[in-house]
Amino acid sequence: MASPFISDRIQNHDDKVLLARITEYFEAFANADADKMDSMVADDYRMSDIPLGIVRSSKGAWYQQNKGFSSLMTNISVEAISLHGSSEPGSFAVLENVVRFTLKVDPPEVAKPNLPPGIKKGDSSGMIMLSTIWWNSDGKIARELEYGKLLWEGFDINAFNGW
């Protein structure tokens, strides 16, 4: 079975520890494995998810939000465009990526502002994302910052090749 984290474009990154951590984390996200993701983040973890309007979410709150995502979405994939940064303690990494998904259910009212207008159960969509992750001294994720935009009509991930 193919991985839901498509990393072809970043396989040659020099920092193999970083590549392994990023792969593990985004595979867990795409597999809707909130428990695995939770095990990779520090106790004092903080998440900011700008597309969702979340400025600061604690580890516990983000765990619950991730579990909620898995009840809403299926066929999740994450395709890496580029990876920069380091796995060194105190450093950060930036992953440019595209998240695609299909709705398992009709979206609840609270989720509708973050989805394309009129999207319903069985419809697919996605977002182009910039994910920034900071590492603590134990190699755990201390902070995460997500920026993104819904995919637009005619979106072509290959337009990002060759930067």
Briefly describe each language-model feature range.
Residues 1-163:
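C-terminal and inter-domain tail/linker signature
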